[in-house]
Amino acid sequence: MLAPLGSCYQGTRLHQEGGRRRLCMGWLGRTLDRMAHWLLKWRIIRGPARWIVNSRYAWSVVSRTDRVRARRLQTRVLSDKLPQHISIIMDGNRRYASDSGLAATLGHRAGKEKLEEVMDWVLEMNIPYLTVYALSTENITGRKPDELEALFDLYVEGLNDLSKDERIHKNSVKVRVAGRKELLPQRVLDAIENTEKLTEKYDKFVFTVCLAYGSREEIIDAVRGIAADHADGSLDLDSIDEVEISKRLWTGDMPDPDLVIRTSGEERISNFLLWQSAYAEYYFTDVYWPSFSKTDLLEAIEAYQNRKRRFGE
């Protein structure tokens, strides 16, 4: 049975209005996106730029075009040499929560969920090493006890999720935790032991979480081990070199990072992989960690690809 002419006209009109609305939203998203990234280049107006990029309201519009930009950018990135080891200083969870009117614990949870997304993107691009800075030794002494306890609970949940995650086992991802584990509560240690044991035989990808981590402490531990071995005669003085020190670090069984990314606009290293990142390329973005998008990751990789690595020369 044919529909009445009036209903056909109405359907066509609604379809046209829907198309115009989608075009308008797409234009608005692209404009906001371009404006945000342009503003971030100018230090004097970082405040409004950061709000645009990190606002959960603005981001809901921007994200509609972000996927399109990510696909185009990914095509370019995948056609060039990729970093083999990406390290990330995941910063900005608490500021994201504050700007969004949320409790700090919810900001940390949003950061956990973002890490799961980023792992997907890294696996998709076949980048074999991903290392993230989750908790420093300074955080343990400087954070309030209730926030630390909430973080510890989140780490237990995250590690347990990883141990059961189909992506981990399907992609042969070895999960490791580096840091002063003796500073962590028993429930976190149990979760670490379980997850590391379940993934210890995997070797296609390595995902390292730095917990209770401090690079100076790591180097001190390595030096102490070398000194002890030299004292008992098992290590000759002439054998002490960069390779000997590197292999004694908590991260000694993996290559140095090629690219170190830090979110939230802070431009400092914060005692993270000091020895290992001597020749790494650094990329800083004003985006808070929970707002970090696939496009942000791809832009970091593209910036890395556009640099000429000199390795100290």
Predicted regions and their residues:
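Flexible, compositionally biased loop and terminal segments
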Residues: 2-11, 15, 19-313
